[in-house]
A protein has these predicted regions:
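Perimembrane loop-to-helix junctions flanking transmembrane segments
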Residues: 58-77
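Cytoplasmic juxtamembrane regions at transmembrane-helix boundaries
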Residues: 6-7, 99-125, 183-209, 261-271
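Alpha-helical transmembrane segments and their helix-start/interface "positive-inside/aromatic belt" motifs
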Residues: 2, 18-45, 110-126, 184-199, ...
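C-terminal transmembrane-bundle signature of multipass membrane proteins
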Residues: 47, 194-271
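Alpha-helical transmembrane segments of multi-pass membrane proteins
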Residues: 42-60
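Membrane-proximal helix-loop-helix units in multi-pass membrane proteins
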Residues: 126-190
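Interfacial helix-start motif at the membrane-water boundary
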Residues: 71-91, 119-122
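Generic alpha-helical transmembrane segments
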Residues: 84-96, 160-179, 239-243
Length: 271
């Protein structure tokens, strides 16, 4: 008796990459936290920031002291133009792409939704490394740099790293994540996550505060002091990151609803 053996089609490149980074969905078991993705993503972010910090350490004191020197234009302004172009394109393409491809009525099974929240927590793990690195490697370095060097323009090696790379990248990532969450996840499709909105707004408002800070340092507050009133806006807006506790609480509440066995998961309001 002949048997017909059905073979599954070979996995495509995208599926193989998803399996390798730990994002592939195995329907034979319950959704799992994508630890491999979180570890690989964290390692990648650490590598990028480490290389950037090495670049700063290598080229700041020899070609980063005078904006009007030709070497400064080569080593720093070219870097500025490249990273700002890439970040701007990511925002200009990503925002309309996510918005105009949104489903009219997003729906998903409880299992799909639970897996999605685990994925969001994995992204949060990667983002937490970016925040710590930004505070430890770039924010403190920026203040220390301007205490020992002359601020000739708004474009200094530490500003190009912090205000024209780390913060804009986090801003674009936060905006894309905010739009995606509220257009793809049923739990958030008819409400607004205030904690996530506070975090994104903090990143956005830091940029005009940067303009005020540079204007103040140029005209009436030349000395760089950590606790100067002109820096209070950065501290206040930086506190917006504490709202991540509220966002994680929202996710945990929904995860409890989805994993409860005594009653079916129901959509409840997000506070």
């Amino acid at each position: 008796m002949n048997r017909t053996v059905t073979q599954s089609p070979p996995a495509g490149m995208g599926q193989r990459i998803s399996q390798w980074v730990g994002l592939a969905d195995d329907e034979s078991r319950a959704p799992q936290m994508p630890w491999r993705f979180a570890i690989l993503g964290t390692a990648l972010v650490c590598a990028i920031l480490s290389v950037y910090r090495w670049y700063q350490q290598t080229h700041s004191f020899n070609v980063g002291l005078d904006y009007f020197e030709e070497d400064f234009q080569i080593y720093w302004m070219r870097l500025f133009y490249v990273q700002m172009t890439l970040i701007t394109l990511a925002g200009m393409i990503g925002v309309p792409l996510i918005w105009f491809t949104r489903p009219a009525n997003p729906t998903m099974t409880a299992r799909q939704e639970l897996r999605l929240y685990y994925l969001i927590l994995g992204f949060a793990a990667v983002a937490s490394v970016v925040v710590v690195a930004a505070l430890g490697l770039f924010v403190e370095a920026d203040a220390a740099w301007h205490q020992v060097t002359v601020r000739d323009t708004d474009f200094t090696p530490t500003h190009i790293a912090l205000f024209y790379f780390v913060i804009p990248a986090g801003l674009v990532g936060g905006v894309l994540g905010f739009i995606w969450l509220h257009t793809r996840v049923p739990y958030f499709s008819h409400r607004v996550s205030m904690p996530l909105g506070i975090m994104v707004a903090g990143f956005i408002l830091i940029m005009p505060n940067l303009g005020f800070n540079e204007w103040g340092h140029t005209f009436f507050y030349a000395e760089e002091l950590f606790a100067a009133p002109i820096h209070w806006g950065f501290v206040f807006l930086g506190w917006a990151l504490f709202a991540i506790g509220g966002f994680v609480t929202q996710l945990i509440i929904r995860i409890i609803e989805l994993t409860r066995v005594d009653s079916p998961a129901t959509t409840s309001s997000a506070f």
